[in-house]
From Swiss-Prot:
GO CC annotation: cytoplasm; small ribosomal subunit
Protein family (similarity comment): Belongs to the bacterial ribosomal protein bS16 family.
GO MF annotation list: structural constituent of ribosome
Protein name: Small ribosomal subunit protein bS16
Database matches in NCBIfam families: S16
Source species: Orientia tsutsugamushi (strain Ikeda) (Rickettsia tsutsugamushi)
């Protein structure tokens, strides 16, 4: 069973609120999850400390057991200065370094 750390959307229409959850990668985005490890409210200002809340000890636990975070969750984890496993760090850095904008084709 592959486990992911990802966002699950909740809240009303045009008023999004996301739970940061540990879920099986086959389950739907808003479907069943194993554990809730935080929340993200994009409606709050960026400097508000309640915008992103994480349970750092539980995230470290799941990362040590092989959970794969999504790109957005990796950004949140880095804000909280949680150390990512070396394999995830390499994968994330490779994606950023190999990104090259393709030149437009002129005819």
């Amino acid at each position: 069973m592959a486990v992911k750390i990802r966002l699950a959307r909740s809240g009303a229409k045009k008023c999004a609120y996301f739970k940061i959850v540990i879920a099986n990668n086959c389950s739907p985005r808003d479907g069943a999850f194993i554990e809730k490890v935080g929340h993200y409210n994009p409606m709050l200002p960026k400097d508000n400390h309640e915008r992103v809340v994480l349970k750092t000890d539980r995230i470290e636990h799941w990362l040590s057991h092989g959970a794969q975070p999504t790109e957005k969750v990796i950004n949140f984890i880095q804000q909280f200065s949680i150390t990512l496993p070396l394999a995830i760090q390499k994968k994330h850095n490779i994606k950023l370094k190999n990104y090259v904008a393709k030149p437009s084709k002129k005819k």
